[in-house]
Curated annotation (Swiss-Prot):
Top-rank lineage group of the source organism: Eukaryota
Main location: membrane
The keyword Lipoprotein is assigned to this record: yes
Pfam family, one: C2-set_2
Mode of membrane association: Single-pass type I membrane protein
Disulfide bond sites: 37-165, 42-100, 159-217, 261-305, 347-392, 421-430, 432-488
Annotated GO biological process: axon regeneration; cell adhesion; cell-cell adhesion via plasma-membrane adhesion molecules; cellular response to mechanical stimulus; central nervous system myelin formation; negative regulation of axon extension; negative regulation of neuron apoptotic process; negative regulation of neuron differentiation
Protein name: Myelin-associated glycoprotein
Residues binding a ganglioside GT1b (d18:1(4E)), per UniProt: 65-67, 118, 124-128
Annotated region (Disordered), positions in chain: 582-608
Span list, region Required for normal axon myelination in the central nervous system: 577-626
Species of provenance: Homo sapiens
Amino acid sequence: MIFLTALPLFWIMISASRGGHWGAWMPSSISAFEGTCVSIPCRFDFPDELRPAVVHGVWYFNSPYPKNYPPVVFKSRTQVVHESFQGRSRLLGDLGLRNCTLLLSNVSPELGGKYYFRGDLGGYNQYTFSEHSVLDIVNTPNIVVPPEVVAGTEVEVSCMVPDNCPELRPELSWLGHEGLGEPAVLGRLREDEGTWVQVSLLHFVPTREANGHRLGCQASFPNTTLQFEGYASMDVKYPPVIVEMNSSVEAIEGSHVSLLCGADSNPPPLLTWMRDGTVLREAVAESLLLELEEVTPAEDGVYACLAENAYGQDNRTVGLSVMYAPWKPTVNGTMVAVEGETVSILCSTQSNPDPILTIFKEKQILSTVIYESELQLELPAVSPEDDGEYWCVAENQYGQRATAFNLSVEFAPVLLLESHCAAARDTVQCLCVVKSNPEPSVAFELPSRNVTVNESEREFVYSERSGLVLTSILTLRGQAQAPPRVICTARNLYGAKSLELPFQGAHRLMWAKIGPVGAVVAFAILIAIVCYITQTRRKKNVTESPSFSAGDNPPVLFSSDFRISGAPEKYESERRLGSERRLLGLRGEPPELDLSYSHSDLGKRPTKDSYTLTEELAEYAEIRVK
């Protein structure tokens, strides 16, 4: 387009085309507002050899062929026109100058169509030109918006109206442009084919709020009531902005959670829900809902909504906090310690909210923290009393969990006061009670016999452990008369302790050993002594009867521990010592014992008196160990 002051190109083309041929030049299309007028510029030519005295012309509507009887718009020869054009058409050009410009007034929609010109030079020199002009009757201004309007980028919007009526000139104004910018009327412009337009330009920088805004242009004609308005909706492109989203969400484990993300953009955005870089759901939409069924602690965290289109992107995050009961606590630390060392134990768990952590031992609270996931227990200089079972308990308003753990304190053996020896009848039992960790090895030493017995000799030693206390029992048989000294020694990798075991309740044990049988034996010995004295006295007065003689195997009375008939006393002593060595698990020959024997013949009586006790007939023997 060029300004009005420029040389009309159309007329240059007409002038340059003169060459003596039949031809016409007019705009292929032309527009006019209803109720106004329109001037259709036209030029024609004919061969130079034709020199007509008068040149006539005819304008036809919608057909160039007279035989079709098209409506006559204008006819210079007769001035007879179709009724639709009565008083509406006239020729502005001079046909003698080959100017066929036509003016139509008070145009209406039914006048819209094709217009053809026919030259009449007289006789057979008549020619209907194929070139024609299409008239368009309009009612609205033409608002031209750039194909792409981007928020933040300056744009130019134009309003264009036809200005082909020399009698009425349009005036343009903008409607709904408040806040957009001030319009600039550029003026009247000529188009390439010789038609004219009135143009007004509006420059502004659109915002996202301008999207969908109706911008209007009005064409009015002074001194008339004619007004024409046109509108265009602004299609402003802009990047997404997230306008709707959940705030931080708290949910109980196992419940249903919905997260909503809504964005404003043009065109609509691609919405994506993500967590830790993983796409959970996406769609091209203005809003997107993320459904989480039966949430677990693993779904606790930060969720991101990303909105993007060709013009940019936006993102926002929302935190999901899943509330749940504490997990079973885990315990880390030294579970085995040596007496005197410092022990540090860490109890930890996971929950939401953070729990109350407590460490118990035997229902006694040792340490506790509130709303923390870790608890450190410090035990300086541990002792055996610290050994045992502990509990770490975690709780919040959603539940409670606990974990038990054991602390093992290792220490050197300690011989307890319960250790002792006791005699019962012909048996001696020695108890060695040891507290130790780890379990000790226990040995019993008999110094007087140079004998050591340990736990491996199950025939003599029985051991039983209860917690940190080990009880070892040594059993000696046939030792009640002269119980030996017994020393108990307990040993582990942290040391050794020895103790000579005391005999408890010796006098009570002796009478318990004697018991009813011992009382009978003692009474029999007493009767024998009385009988012996009586018999001795009688010997002085009574002559020995020849019929009384000692038997081959007279009855013999030993102590309560040794009762053997028909065997020498020396053999009995040797047998007993051998038995004792077998009791202690010793090998070898028993040592020789120096035994002295004393035997008394208490005399014989020829007959047995009915009042004489059986013991009166017994011999008395005594064995001494030197």
